[in-house]
UniProtKB/Swiss-Prot annotation:
The lineage of its organism: Eukaryota, Viridiplantae, Streptophyta, Embryophyta, Tracheophyta. It comes from Oryza sativa subsp. japonica. NAD(+) binds at residues 57-88, 193-197, 243. It is found in: Cytoplasm. This is UDP-D-apiose/UDP-D-xylose synthase. Transmembrane segments: none annotated. It holds the Pfam family Epimerase.
């Protein structure tokens, strides 16, 4: 075959890492490959590298275009393995055959943390234990996806609201190697997720210290983009409550007011999925710089309150859809009303970017409005007609 007809990834072995070394093709066991992050990472690896991916998940809807069947140019590059890591003996075999395991599997929807705390703890800690064990025992590298929730509350949140130190960065900017992890009381089961994620981080770190496990831990700060979460009643349960962007998207698609929990005063940062995937790509191909590291991956420039996010999404969706906003586009609801008993929250989550910038030279690029336009355009094209049909059927049967 001539080079002109080769797929883009065919020459990937000639690429160099950040230290000028050739990048050898890897075999990657990607657990949770069928989800939001996994689907984008699979696309990136198939388009730009020669790596081979064992895509492990219980569903493949978001990567069906890659695996069912694989396009001719990806033959032998990606394979789907339908298994549940809770109880499938095939998992160890896949990890043994791989050079690198990436674990994306998790329950990571805030509405589940205090309504399904046992499932949340089991999914994020107990079910992750065999993955760590198999990697450690077989001397395989692990990239484990954690969460920015492990930081919990900021130090500044314990100061009076008018205290001048609340505005000082050292009281709210979150640093991987310095910031304490501060959670609420046990009765606030919202912290079940953060505690489980922190404990598996500590176990991975201990495996590295005592048994030489090569690992990288990723702490995502609100990664946003197409294929995130689900729209209730369309490609997810009708009673399901996805994360904030999908919740607001669902409201906009149905022309319902956006629900602001406790007034929407919490502050968050948001990063575009394609920017974040570039950071993960750098971790994969620069093990000497990534091993033993914990990386914040977010965009501190895209900080807004949840209320401001709702306002921006309302404006952007009106432009995308051509539909004017509602006269009353937002309503306030209490956290108890929206999430149930046991909910608690962190006031602010701003990532420090020093370590990832120093080790990998990575910085996010996409402004918040641009990523919202891309995401809401996708949501509108993907879901609007299905929601119209659903609403019309509900109206006819009532």
């Amino acid at each position: 075959m001539s080079s002109s007809s080769s797929p883009p990834a065919a020459s990937a072995a000639a690429r160099l890492d950040l230290d000028g070394n050739p990048i050898a093709p890897l075999t990657i066991c990607m657990i949770g490959a069928g989800g939001f992050i996994g689907s984008h990472l699979c696309e990136k690896l198939m388009a730009e590298t020669a790596h081979v991916v064992y895509a492990v998940d219980v569903y493949c809807d978001k990567i069906r275009h890659l695996v069912d069947p694989a396009p001719p140019h990806l033959h032998g590059r990606i394979s789907f393995h339908r298994l549940n890591i809770k109880n499938d003996s095939r998992l160890e075999g896949l990890i043994k055959m791989a050079d690198l395991t990436i674990n994306l599997a998790a329950i990571c929807t805030p509405a589940d943390y205090n309504t399904r705390p046992l499932d949340t703890i089991y999914s994020n800690f107990i079910d992750a234990l065999p993955v760590v064990k198999y990697c450690s025992e077989n001397n395989k590298r692990l990239i484990h996806f954690s969460t920015c929730e492990v930081y919990g509350k900021t130090i500044g949140s314990f100061l009076p609201t008018d205290h001048p130190l609340r505005k000082e960065p050292e009281f709210y900017v979150l640093k991987e190697d310095e910031s304490p992890c501060i959670f609420g009381p046990i009765v606030k089961q919202r912290w079940s997720y953060a505690c489980a994620k922190q404990l598996i981080e500590r176990l991975i770190f201990a495996e590295g210290a005592e048994n030489g496990l090569e690992f990288t831990i990723v702490r995502p700060f609100n990664w946003i983009g197409p294929r995130m979460d689900f729209i209730p009643g369309v490609d997810g349960p009708s009673e399901g409550v996805p994360r904030v962007l999908a919740c607001f998207s669902n409201n906009l698609l149905r022309r319902e007011p956006l629900k602001l929990v406790d007034g929407g005063q919490s502050q968050r940062t948001f990063v575009y999925i394609k920017d974040a995937i570039e950071a993960v790509h750098l971790m994969i191909e620069n093990p000497a710089r990534a091993n033993g590291q914990i990386f914040n991956v977010g965009n501190p420039n895209n900080e807004v309150t949840v209320r401001q996010l709702a306002e921006m999404m309302t404006e952007v969706y009106a432009n995308v859809s051509g539909e004017p906003p509602l006269d009353e586009p937002m309503i306030d609801v209490s956290s108890k009303q929206f999430y149930g008993e046991g909910y608690d929250d962190s006031d602010k989550r701003i990532p420090d970017m020093t370590i990832i910038n120093k080790q990998l030279g990575w910085n996010p690029k996409t402004p918040l409005k641009d990523l919202l336009e891309t995401t809401l355009t996708y949501q509108h094209k993907t879901y609007k007609e299905a929601i119209k049909r659903q609403m019309s059927q509900a109206s006819a049967s009532s």
